[in-house]
Amino acid sequence: ENIYETEEFLTKKGIESSSAKMVKKGTLLIAMYGATAGVLAVSHIDAAINQAILALIPNIDINLFYLKSTIANQIDVAVHRLVQGGQPNFNASIINAFELRLPTLPEQKAIADVLSAADEEISLLQKGLEEEKLKKKSLMQLLLTGLVRVNE
């Protein structure tokens, strides 16, 4: 996920009178609980977040997509441990306990590029699958209402 715009906005007064925090573009965001727990996104804009979002701001030089992919992998593993008949909840302690392998920046970029290409391929396949599902739904409508007949 990438965030390039928001649907809602806060005024400066709104930020000051709430628990919202401002984050700068390039921040890795993690949903901490609820239906979106564990979902990661990179903010490509300065934005306000609430207490349900954890902002990760690296203090080292790291490829952001590599970091996102590494954290996503760790979250997938953690979700299996956290789910006990309900939705998983994360907190900063759980995320801070993740151990990250940090190869050189060129290797991080190479890994990130491969994973990004895989993500793009998956997105295209998912889009194609959705299109096929719509075609099937249309065909079902035509066949089941008798608008189109099947020859025996």
Where are these regions (language model features)?
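Short, charged beta-turn/beta-strand-edge "cap" motif at the junction between a beta-strand
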Residues: A35-G38
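Conserved catalytic core of Hanks-type protein kinase domains
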Residues: M32, T70, L142
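Basic, amphipathic alpha-helical recognition segments used for DNA target recognition
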Residues: N2-E5, K25, V42-D46, Q51-L102
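A generic structural signal for residues embedded in beta-strands
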Residues: I30-A31, A117
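Conserved beta-strand positions that form and line the central face of beta-propeller blades
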Residues: F9, A55, R149
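Sequence-specific dsDNA recognition surfaces
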Residues: E1-K25
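Amphipathic alpha-helical coiled-coil/heptad-repeat segments
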Residues: E99-E152
